[in-house]
């Protein structure tokens, strides 16, 4: 079962997110997600197996330029995670579908995402669910 997350879901959402982004703390994620959930142009979806939360997806609208698109806003998959024992069963595809449906209700005609160059599993997922590679970039930073 997939459902849109609410404020009451922050603790479980943050725990799942820390599996995807292990450099973050649950408390930090709760705070960040509370701010994001309050915005009308962002949404989280949770996947359940019976009563157990097994995955989540974070999506939002991007109004700035999104590589490979020519419309605005663009729905954007910011993150997606499914617990190990539930992968390869279509859960991530269902989460993505919920995000895409949400983006359509917000007036989007395009949906985008990204992944790190060395994340082969994520790249394969994106290709398997219909994304097309738009570009590869290298990001730079510089201390001032």
What role is predicted for each listed range?
Residues 1-13:
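A short beta-loop-alpha structural element at the N-terminal edge
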Residues 14-28, 65:
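Helix-loop element at the rim of GNAT/NAT acetyltransferase active sites that forms part
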Residues 25-46, 58:
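Active-site rim helix/loop that mediates acceptor-substrate recognition in acyltransferases
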Residues 82, 88-101, 124-128:
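Conserved acetyl-CoA-binding loop-helix of GNAT-fold acetyltransferases
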Residues 93, 105, 117-136:
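Conserved active-site alpha-helix within GNAT-family acetyltransferase domains
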Residues 96, 103-115:
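Conserved GNAT acetyl-CoA-binding A-motif
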């Amino acid at each position: 079962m997939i459902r849109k997350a609410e404020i009451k879901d922050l603790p479980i959402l943050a725990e799942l997110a820390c599996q995807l982004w292990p450099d973050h703390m649950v408390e930090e994620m709760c705070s960040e997600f509370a701010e994001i959930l309050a915005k009308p142009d962002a949404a989280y979806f949770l996947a359940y197996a019976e009563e157990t939360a097994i995955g989540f997806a974070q999506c939002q609208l991007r109004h700035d330029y999104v590589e490979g698109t020519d419309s605005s806003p663009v729905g954007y998959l910011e993150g997606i995670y499914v617990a190990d024992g539930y992968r390869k069963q279509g859960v991530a595809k269902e989460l993505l579908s919920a995000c895409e449906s949400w983006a359509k209700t917000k007036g989007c005609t395009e949906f985008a995402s990204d992944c790190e160059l060395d994340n082969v599993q994520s790249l394969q997922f994106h290709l398997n669910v219909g994304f097309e590679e738009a570009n590869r970039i290298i990001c730079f930073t510089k201390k001032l």
